[in-house]
C-alpha cells in the first residue's frame, strides 16, 4: 500500500505543480486563444501527464525513505540485519536482479518495494513485521517485494498513471472551458477564458484525479496476485506466502483500520475500489488454487 500511495500522492503534487507552472508561462492562454484547440490540448495533456508520472517514478525511492524514515542497511549491525541482507541477496539472485537497497523503518507490520528501475530499487521492511513474523514468513514477504521488482511493477504503474494523467488533464480543461463559457455566455466571449476557467480546471483535476485512481488501484490489485505467485516461485513453495498472509490477517484483525489498509486488508463496498491490495482471503485462495 505504501508504495502505491506514495507514488499517487507524489504524482498528484507533481501534476499540480506542472499545471500551475504551465499557467504562469501562458500555455493555457495559448491553448484557448482561439477557442479550445483539442489537438494541442491532448498533446499538452500527454506531455504533462507522462512527464509528471515519470518524475514521480524518479523521486519514488527518495520519497519513500523520507516519508517512512527508512534506514538503509549499509553495514549490518546485528544478526537480524545480516540475515535480511543475505535473504534479499539470495532472492534477487534467483530473480536475476541487481541487489536492491535494503532498509528498515519503524511501523506496523508492512513492507514495500520501490525505485525507478529494476537495477535501482529499494526493499523496505517494518520493525513491526520483523517482530511479529517468523523468518519463513518474513522471507515470503521479502520474496513478494522482490517479485514486484522482477515484474517491473513500478514502471508498469508509471505508464498506467501517465495514461490516466493525460485523460485527467485533458478532460479537466474541457469541462473547465465549457463551464467558463456557460458562466460568460452573456459577456463578450472573444477574449481568453476568465478566472472561472483557472479555478475550475484545478478543481476538476483534483476530482478527476481521485476518481481515476480507481483505475490505477485496479491494476495494482492485479499485480499483487502476480507478486504473490512470483514469491512462491522464488521460494519454491507457496506455503510460506500463504502463512505470511494468514499471519497478517491474524495480526491486524480487530486492530487499527489504517494499519489494516497499509497491510493490504481491503474493506468492502466503495472503499474496495480505492484499495491497492485485494482482500487477503482472495490472495490466499489464489495461491491455494495454483498448481
Swiss-Prot record:
InterPro entries: HtpX_protease (IPR050083), Pept_M48_protease_HtpX (IPR022919), Peptidase_M48 (IPR001915)
Cited Pfam families: Peptidase_M48
Membrane-related topology note: Multi-pass membrane protein
Active-site positions on this chain: 145
Gene Ontology molecular-function annotations: metalloendopeptidase activity; zinc ion binding
Binding-site residues, Zn(2+): 144, 148, 224
Transmembrane annotation, as ranges: 4-24, 38-58, 159-179, 199-219
Cofactor note: Binds 1 zinc ion per subunit.
Lineage top rank: taxon: Bacteria
Cell compartments where the protein resides: Cell inner membrane
GO cellular component, one term: plasma membrane
Alphabetical UniProt keywords: Cell inner membrane, Cell membrane, Hydrolase, Membrane, Metal-binding, Metalloprotease, Protease, Transmembrane, Transmembrane helix, Zinc
Keyword Transmembrane helix in record: yes
Cofactor entry: Zn(2+)
A biological process term (GO) from this entry: proteolysis
Similarity-based family: Belongs to the peptidase M48B family.
Name listed for the protein in its UniProt record: Protease HtpX homolog
Gene designation per UniProt: htpX
Amino acid at each position: 500500500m505504501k508504495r502505491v500511495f506514495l507514488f499517487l500522492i507524489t504524482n498528484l503534487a507533481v501534476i499540480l505543480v506542472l499545471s500551475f507552472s504551465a499557467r504562469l508561462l501562458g500555455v493555457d492562454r495559448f491553448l484557448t486563444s482561439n477557442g479550445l484547440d483539442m489537438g494541442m490540448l491532448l498533446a499538452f495533456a500527454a506531455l504533462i501527464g507522462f512527464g509528471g508520472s515519470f518524475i514521480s517514478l524518479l523521486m519514488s525511492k527518495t520519497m519513500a525513505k523520507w516519508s517512512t524514515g527508512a534506514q538503509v542497511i549499509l553495514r549490518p549491525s546485528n544478526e537480524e540485519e545480516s540475515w535480511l541482507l543475505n535473504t534479499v541477496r539470495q532472492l534477487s539472485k534467483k530473480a536475476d536482479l541487481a541487489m536492491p537497497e535494503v532498509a528498515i523503518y519503524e511501523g506496523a507490520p508492512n513492507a514495500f518495494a520501490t525505485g525507478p528501475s529494476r537495477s535501482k530499487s529499494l526493499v523496505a521492511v517494518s520493525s513491526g513485521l520483523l517482530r511479529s513474523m517468523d523468518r519463513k514468513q518474513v522471507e515470503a514477504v521479502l520474496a513478494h517485494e522482490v517479485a514486484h521488482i522482477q515484474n517491473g511493477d513500478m514502471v508498469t504503474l508509471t505508464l498506467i498513471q501517465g495514461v490516466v494523467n493525460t485523460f485527467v488533464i485533458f478532460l479537466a480543461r474541457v469541462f473547465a472551458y465549457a463551464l467558463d463559457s456557460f458562466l460568460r455566455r452573456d459577456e463578450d466571449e472573444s477574449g481568453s477564458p476568465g478566472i472561472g476557467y483557472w479555478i475550475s480546471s484545478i478543481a476538476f483535476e483534483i476530482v478527476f484525479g481521485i476518481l481515476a485512481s480507481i483505475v490505477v488501484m485496479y491494476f495494482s490489485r492485479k499485480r499483487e496476485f502476480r507478486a504473490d505467485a512470483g514469491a512462491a516461485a522464488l521460494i519454491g513453495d507457496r506455503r510460506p506466502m500463504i502463512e505470511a498472509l494468514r499471519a497478517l490477517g491474524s495480526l491486524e484483525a480487530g486492530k487499527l483500520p489504517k494499519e489494516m489498509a497499509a497491510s493490504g486488508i481491503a474493506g468492502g463496498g466503495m472503499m474496495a475500489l480505492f484499495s491497492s491490495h485485494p482482500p487477503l482471503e482472495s490472495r490466499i485462495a489464489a495461491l491455494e488454487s495454483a498448481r
